[in-house]
Amino acid sequence: MKVSAALLCLLLIAATFSPQGLAQPDAINAPVTCCYNFTNRKISVQRLASYRRITSSKCPKEAVIFKTIVAKEICADPKQKWVQDSMDHLDKQIQTPKP
């Protein structure tokens, strides 16, 4: 009986530390971009190409990262009205096909 209990314990330990047991989904190991400071200036919508929201629990603040037409990324506070207006403008641009 002691041998079977010891064997069972050994198998459980081996299963816990096997490579498959240590494997994690790629999303867990993916790098997270966080914003620690926000821009103090309003950015003209003509300079903006796209945006993405940052809502990761690994980041200290929720944020919006705007990407400009020259590929510069700028962190902004999603609570500010100009940020919300800029996101709305970009959303409408995507929905409206260009001739």
UniProtKB/Swiss-Prot annotation:
Keyword Glycoprotein: yes
Glycosylation sites per record: N37
Region forming the signal peptide: 1-23
SS bonds (residue pairs): C34-C59, C35-C75
Gene3D superfamilies per UniProt: 2.40.50.40
Residue positions, PTM Pyrrolidone carboxylic acid: Q24
InterPro entries: Chemokine_b/g/d, Chemokine_CC_CS, Chemokine_IL8-like_dom, Interleukin_8-like_sf
Compartment(s) where it occurs, according to its Swiss-Prot or TrEMBL record: Secreted
Origin: domain of life: Eukaryota
Keyword Phosphoprotein included in the entry's annotation: no
SMART domains, alphabetized: SCY
Keywords: Chemotaxis, Cytokine, Disulfide bond, Glycoprotein, Inflammatory response, Pyrrolidone carboxylic acid, Secreted, Signal
GO cellular component, one term: extracellular space
BP GO annotations: antimicrobial humoral immune response mediated by antimicrobial peptide; chemokine-mediated signaling pathway; eosinophil chemotaxis; inflammatory response; positive regulation of cell migration; positive regulation of synaptic transmission, glutamatergic; sensory perception of pain
Post-translational modification, as annotated: Processing at the N-terminus can regulate receptor and target cell selectivity. Deletion of the N-terminal residue converts it from an activator of basophil to an eosinophil chemoattractant.
Gene Ontology molecular-function annotations: CCR chemokine receptor binding; chemokine activity
Broad class of the protein's primary localization: secreted
Xref: Pfam families: IL8
Complex and partners: Monomer or homodimer; in equilibrium. Is tethered on endothelial cells by glycosaminoglycan (GAG) side chains of proteoglycans. Interacts with TNFAIP6 (via Link domain).
Function: Acts as a ligand for C-C chemokine receptor CCR2. Signals through binding and activation of CCR2 and induces a strong chemotactic response and mobilization of intracellular calcium ions. Exhibits a chemotactic activity for monocytes and basophils but not neutrophils or eosinophils. Plays an important role in mediating peripheral nerve injury-induced neuropathic pain. Increases NMDA-mediated synaptic transmission in both dopamine D1 and D2 receptor-containing neurons, which may be caused by MAPK/ERK-dependent phosphorylation of GRIN2B/NMDAR2B.
Entry similarity comment: Belongs to the intercrine beta (chemokine CC) family.
Designated name of the protein: C-C motif chemokine 2
Gene: CCL2
